[in-house]
Design a protein with these regions (language model features):
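Short S/T/G/P-rich N-terminal loop/turn motif that feeds into the first structured element of a domain
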Residues: 1-66, 84-91
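Conserved short beta-strand edge segments in small beta-sheet-based binding/regulatory domains
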Residues: 71-87
Length: 91
């Protein structure tokens, strides 16, 4: 399955949030073996999305991710909530 997480940041926090998100993605690969990618919304570069593929145990990964986001300091750079979507193959 795939996990997508998106959130808004302020212009002042954008560079730090991108650095934190890149570190989080690297940590996901190292700690739990899940590769990720980072994107920004085309029409709104203050909206950031983390995409994680090949997640075999989504509940466990999302619990790990929630803890990791807090411990790496990324949560404090986000405006509002992190929105998480879980997709599974349908065909």
């Amino acid at each position: 399955s795939q996990i997508y997480v998106y959130y808004k940041v302020t212009a002042a926090n954008r560079a730090a949030a991108l650095a934190g998100a890149k570190a989080l993605i690297a940590r996901a690969a190292a700690d739990v073996g899940v590769d990720g990618a980072l994107s920004c919304r085309a029409e709104d570069p203050l909206t950031i999305m983390e995409a994680y593929g090949s997640v075999h145990d989504a509940p466990a990964f999302m619990a790990w991710l929630d803890t990791a986001v807090s411990s790496c300091g990324l949560r404090s750079l986000i405006e509002g909530d992190r929105h998480t979507e879980h997709f599974v193959p349908c065909a």
